[in-house]
């Protein structure tokens, strides 16, 4: 119990960072017996649902929208973290769904060629990104998995789990692919491996516009926050911002509402000004 006190618990633990925080997603606990899916493989965002987690994703969507409206060329977002199990894939798929519901054309790329967690959402198809990067015999259009309910939401899975993921990502065909996709989509989210394990996220990030860094409450040790601040100050990742995931909601209140919940303009924008 004592060592749990060293973990990030909520927004208060991030107050000393100058890294902007885009949003806070409350802990999602699924009824596993009911749907036979782990919490990591569930789409919780629904068009007319007004529960706490859907409201949290709407706030996050508004904040991402505000960023993009300031620079319409910014449409490729890398999602990474320090730890495995931070909920990157869960966030990537649900943020994407929140934009698809608004009628935006959205793509999620599974950039974790080692585990393919996003791919599990769409049945882990045998053909995907690794096959394209390795051979380029396939058109990227053939890799797309289209959502059954929202035809404007697509996923590119990993496909074959390769023995040499880093080498594949360093191939020039990745840059060519992302450039082509920019012309087709409003938003592109790339789920990447944690940065402390392999170099893959840094390789992919050079083709992206912004980095969403997932901090999982109850998982990330507070001692790593200074490292996150260093990464931000040294600009090792472009336009880094935090998404806090898995916070405990208290007393039925919207625990993620901290300062900018009623509109990005009133909160996040002024938050950025304060940090300058």
List PLM regions with ranges.
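Conserved Walker-type P-loop NTP-binding/catalytic site
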Residues: 130-180
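Well-ordered beta-strand positions
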Residues: 187, 210-213, 241
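Phosphate-binding/switch loop-helix module in NTP-utilizing enzymes
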Residues: 64, 158-199, 205
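Short boundary/hinge segments that flank catalytic cores
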Residues: 1-105, 111-119, 124-130, 141, ...
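Residue-level preference for the first positions of well-ordered beta-strands
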Residues: 74-78, 153-155, 187-189
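Inter-motif core of Ras-like GTPase G domains
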Residues: 197-218
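Conserved G/P- and acidic residue-centered "switch" motifs that form tight phosphate/ATP-binding loops
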Residues: 89, 110, 191, 209
